[in-house]
Amino acid sequence: MSHVTPAYLKQYHEELMKSFNIKYKNEDTGYFTISQPEKASPDAWGCSTLDVKGASWLIDNISLQDITGADGTTITIGDGSLYTGRAKEGRFHKKLKTNGTPFLLSETDSCASLTYEEMAVMANTGNFSNEMIAFFKKAVARDMLRIGFNGKMIAENTNPEQYKNGEDINIGWHALAKTFNKGSQVISDAFALGKGGDFADVHDLADCLITSKIPEGQREEPGLVVMVGAQLAARERLKLFNMADQPLTLTAGDMLGSSVAGRFAFIPPFMPGKRLAVTTLKNLQILTLKHSQRYRAEDIPQRGVYEHGYLREEGYALGDGYLYAASDENAVTLV
């Protein structure tokens, strides 16, 4: 069954194209789309990318990178240790250290559609056009974080009903850390957290991760943060920053009032509730193959829907595997 494209949808699509600085053209068929021309030059590809910057505080503070290869190893230069001194004989010297983790990009597709009937209701509300694209950007940004914290594998056909947090879409940061250096950076053996347990509280656990797993030269890194699972924070009634998925700016005062083990701490969206991790936000990387991005906004009369889609080659990496330390959610027993 084919539907007639509503007039309000044509108006919305025209406004959307203007926001992408693309000349509007209503085809005779009534079908229209924003997508990448087949023979476009690389310089024109920007019109079909989706910029998620500004969608949330966390997405703005991690590392989003366009790269030129679909696989490889990230390289981080230096380890935060001392590189200055003197030698009685000749010049002082010290070898520069490099660290990194392997990465593999895979095809990743995001999609959100509305029926004509749903859009008719929404079109009567103010600022509908801006809200529609803002929602899709935020949805993609949230999914990028969701996969980063929960991803465990790359399935040929994903199952969102079984893996509601994208566990089968890509290999996220925590899963990468569990295989890095034979798992040295993640506590995977069973332990008890609470009074009389192996660790008295979250502060004690975070301090152990910092002092035993983060290299000595990086323990005082100003950007080091503690990410606390919601279940751990609730158990100890910690009042931590928990709006990392919102587009806002934190002040020094905000950060001072949200701390664990003397470091800024927050509750990340979608991170498993009993996990605790210490790292710098820039160490959390989302990599996209340059020129692989394809954003589309499409009217599909055959199904009576208007659809937003974003296709790209994407993957996750840790800039420095040693700069990530965590306790696995399956290892902890709360006592």
Language model: regions and residue ranges:
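Short, conserved, surface-exposed binding loops centered on an aromatic residue
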Residues: 214-219, 257
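A glycine-rich phosphate-binding loop feature that marks nucleotide/adenosyl-phosphate handling sites
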Residues: 153-157, 223-232
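Sequence/fold signature of self-assembling virion shell proteins
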Residues: 1-48, 53, 58, 168-193, ...
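Phosphate-interacting basic helix/loop segments used at nucleotide- and nucleic-acid interfaces
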Residues: 202-214
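Signature of extracytoplasmic/envelope-associated structural regions
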Residues: 4-7, 63-87, 142, 146-154, ...
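Assembly/oligomerization interface modules of large self-assembling protein complexes
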Residues: 30-113, 166, 170-172
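Alpha-helical scaffold segments that mediate packing/assembly in large oligomeric complexes
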Residues: 116-205
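Amphipathic interfacial helices
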Residues: 207, 217, 224-226
